[in-house]
Amino acid sequence: MLEAFGLGTLAQSSLLLAGLLVCWVTVPRRLIGILAGFGAGALIAAVSFDLLGEAEGLGSWELALWMLIGVAVFLGGDFVVERRFGSEGAGGAMGIVVGSVVDGVPESIIFGIQIATDFPVSISFVAAVFVSNIPQAMAPSADLAASGWSVRRLGTLWLLVVLACGVAAALGYLAADASSSANGDRMAALAAGGLLAMLTNSLMPFAYDRGGALAGAATVVGFCLSVLGT
């Protein structure tokens, strides 16, 4: 269980590191957009080749159902964020944070299940998650800091996200250890659906708004490098 918790927190720890980096290092707005585009490409590759590959045991209808559940979870969280913070500025940035949770928690549950069932954990997938989290955290943190969030508040936000992912990995391990039929298929499909919704509604518009046309090129580069690493 501790191994699962450690892997879950390690894979998502770049959220905390990148989220705090923008508080001490001035990152140009355009560069943040390009990095966000790069992260979007890496995440598209993760959905296409890792998450959907993990969910291959599901039938087509069940796969679609769990992906739609992931979409519903993201949209529900995004709705709460808009009501609390508004749709622009901090609200738009918090939408990406919600997407990080919707994406990271199911991913971490999958890690826990894989460890408990002695299923080989894909190092390339863990690396893709770690790397793609960097612009995914850097982009909204820059906006949140600009809207008045303190370093402590930002650090607490991302630390809670990372710890939630670690706990999710431990719970995935315990669930798999208690049930011989447990697998990560449904969690992978849920994460894929929520992630695609977040990319479309939050991260990719965010990338284009700040990075302009180069965000599209960065997306392709991020996708290609992730594919080459699988």
List the model feature ranges, each with a label.
Residues M1-T230:
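Intrinsically disordered, metal-sensing/regulatory segments
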